[in-house]
A protein has these predicted regions:
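Active-site neighborhoods and metal-handling regions in enzymes and metal-associated proteins
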Residues: 1-328
């Protein structure tokens, strides 16, 4: 591992990236296990226990548990809770609820971090994201369903941002792509106070990765950098409040929120999504199928080693904004 001068951004060796990939796969498995258990009547504390068992069974360590005093393995944020919700036996899910599950794992000192948001249904496991082309709806699905639209918009914005994680691009290209995708999808509030972040030997590292900003600004990305990219969108205004537990972040107006996250490595072959089982191949394919990419030239989908490249520029325009602070 080395640090780039002036930017203090970790550049990992191939061996370190391989270990981060292991941490990413453990994180992904824990998320899958928790999501598979989601149904009306289950508590968020039960989901937390499922994720912790999955992580420890793999010989890994939960990243979040004890982090600055956080008391759980996952963040479970329901409805108007944006991020950092604390699992509780009293938080029992009901049909129609929206829940974000955020999870991290450590393998040999290296971190993975990912999150997904789903709607709680009688068969909630089949309602999770990733089953259809991004930006499309299934036959019979109400096109006015604002929650479904919110989920599509947030996950789509994530993959637009991930697609910019290639050598030679700037950090602002990621932020800009997320913002433009979100704004194109609908009148959603884009959370500014909480952002993505660098990740590696620590869960939160430089640089912060805002979900808004100008293209062509910020540090130049190079192979070996790793980032946790995590857009947060809301149905209403983007103002937030911190609850008395000093962790849970909610919307000030009570509107519902969505949060998606992946850990990605910048490689010469393109973005390698470390917390995606196939390295990001299916996610980028869905992005293209959804028709949201204005200009893209895929140069590699290296299924053999799990690296997915979506090269070429995804060209968008937008307004400038300021940086923000990062959280889990």
């Amino acid at each position: 591992m080395r640090l780039l001068p002036d930017e203090t951004i970790e550049v990992k060796s191939p061996a370190q990236l391989a270990t981060m990939r292991e941490a990413g796969l453990v994180t992904a498995a824990a998320l899958r296990a928790a999501v598979a258990a989601i149904e009306p009547g289950i508590s968020t504390a039960e989901l937390d226990a499922i994720a912790e068992r999955e992580i420890r069974a793999a010989g890994a360590i939960p990243s979040f548990l004890g982090y600055h005093g956080f008391p759980a393995t996952i963040c479970a944020s329901v409805n108007d809770q944006i991020v950092h919700g604390i699992p509780s036996p009293q938080q029992v899910l009901r049909a129609g609820d929206l829940i974000s599950v955020d999870c991290g794992a450590i393998v040999d000192g290296w971190h993975g971090d990912a999150a997904v948001t789903i709607r709680v249904t009688p068969d909630a496991a089949t309602a999770k994201s990733g089953q259809r082309a991004l930006g499309t709806r299934e036959d019979g699905e109400d096109p006015e369903d604002e929650v479904a639209g919110l989920l599509d918009a947030c996950e789509g914005a994530l993959w637009h941002g991930l697609a910019q994680a290639v050598p030679g691009h700037r950090l602002g290209d990621i932020s800009h792509a997320i913002e433009q995708a979100a704004r194109a999808a609908g009148p959603y509030g884009i959370i500014r106070e909480y952002t993505g972040h660098g990740i590696g030997a620590q869960m939160h590292m430089d640089p912060p990765v805002p979900n808004f900003g100008r293209a062509g600004r910020g540090p130049v990305l190079s192979a070996g950098m790793t980032l946790a990219i995590e857009p947060m969108l809301v149905l209403g205004r983007a103002e937030t409040l911190l609850l008395d537990d000093d962790w849970t972040v909610v919307t000030a107006d009570g509107s519902w929120a969505a949060h998606f996250e992946h850990t990605v490595a910048v490689t010469e072959a393109g973005p390698w999504v470390l917390t995606s089982e196939d390295g990001g191949a299916s996610g980028f394919a869905r992005l293209l199928a959804g028709g949201r990419v204005t200009e893209a030239s895929p140069r590699s989908l290296a299924a053999g080693n799990g690296q997915a490249a979506l090269a070429g520029a995804i060209r968008t325009t937008g307004t400038a904004s300021e940086g923000a602070r990062h959280g889990i």
